[in-house]
From Swiss-Prot:
The keyword Disulfide bond does not apply. Signal peptide: none annotated. Belongs to the SURF1 family. GO terms for cellular component: plasma membrane. It comes from the Bacteria. The keyword NAD does not apply. InterPro entries: Surf1/Shy1, Surf1/Surf4. It is found in: Cell membrane. This is SURF1-like protein. PANTHER family: SURFEIT LOCUS PROTEIN, SURFEIT LOCUS PROTEIN 1. Pfam families: SURF1. Keywords: Cell membrane, Membrane, Transmembrane, Transmembrane helix.
Length: 241
């Protein structure tokens, strides 16, 4: 009886997990459709989308803050030199908001030249809003002393730069004001290619539930078979007296 109850509870949990993944599948489809629409639509003023900020194409006007650059380490397969950094600079808008902007990628050998990229000339830029990155336990901590960042944690960046940063950053889509050839532009195409694996996850949970039923039935047959053999042996022993 105890085994049957355990199997039943486990089966219910597995089935519920399967339906939960189907619900997540629906939510992810709606999210991806909304994100695709946002990314392909014309850029709109940031002030008009204060809710649900991530993954919107926006335009902002203001200027970069010099001497505040962050070098975010990242490999780039399309470049002949794989190792390099994303140039991330705080941008102060005309509304006095300060937003980190990922402006482009440069190779490791150009690290000393890239300091020429930032000036405080007023201009308008277009970019896609992105959520703050989370520190991963398997990644080393950011090397603040040498300005080598592995994670763009906006709370940490606020403390290091001494700025009150917004809780999102931008990937710049418009041509950077620096016009430096060594600063390669960034692409947002990968954002529309986010995988939606929740259907596979649902099949996995439902499959485990079905497997549990099969295993339990095999187990019951095995127990019943052993019980029949035992009773048969007892009868034979009694008949021998």
């Amino acid at each position: 009886m105890k085994t049957k109850l355990t199997v039943l509870i486990t089966f219910i949990i597995l089935v519920l997990l399967g339906f939960w993944q189907l619900n997540r599948l629906k939510e992810k489809k709606l999210f991806l459709a909304s994100m695709q629409e946002n990314l392909t639509s014309p850029a709109i003023d940031l002030a008009k989308i204060q809710d649900n900020l991530p993954y919107h194409k926006v335009k902002i006007t203001g200027h970069f803050l010099p001497d505040k650059d962050i070098y975010l380490y990242g490999r780039r397969s399309m470049s002949s030199e794989k190792d390099g950094y994303y140039l991330v600079t705080p941008f102060k808008t005309d509304e006095d908001k300060i937003i980190l902007v990922a402006r482009g990628w440069f190779s490791n050998r150009n690290k000393n030249i890239i300091t020429q990229a930032t000036n405080d000339q007023p201009h308008e830029l277009i970019g896609v809003t992105m959520p703050s990155e989370k520190t991963r336990s398997y990644l080393p901590a950011n090397d603040i002393k040498n300005n080598v960042w592995l994670t763009l944690d906006l709370q940490e960046a606020s403390k290091v730069l001494g700025l009150n940063l917004e809780n999102f950053y931008l990937i710049e889509e418009s041509k950077d004001i620096s016009n430096l050839d060594i600063l390669l532009p960034l692409s947002i195409n990968h954002l529309a290619a986010i995988r939606n694996d929740h259907l596979e996850y649902a099949f996995t949970w439902f499959g485990l539930a079905a497997s549990l039923v099969v295993i339990y039935r095999i187990y019951k047959r095995s127990v019943s078979s052993r019980g029949l053999e035992t009773r048969s042996r007892i009868k034979q022993d009694k008949s021998s007296f």
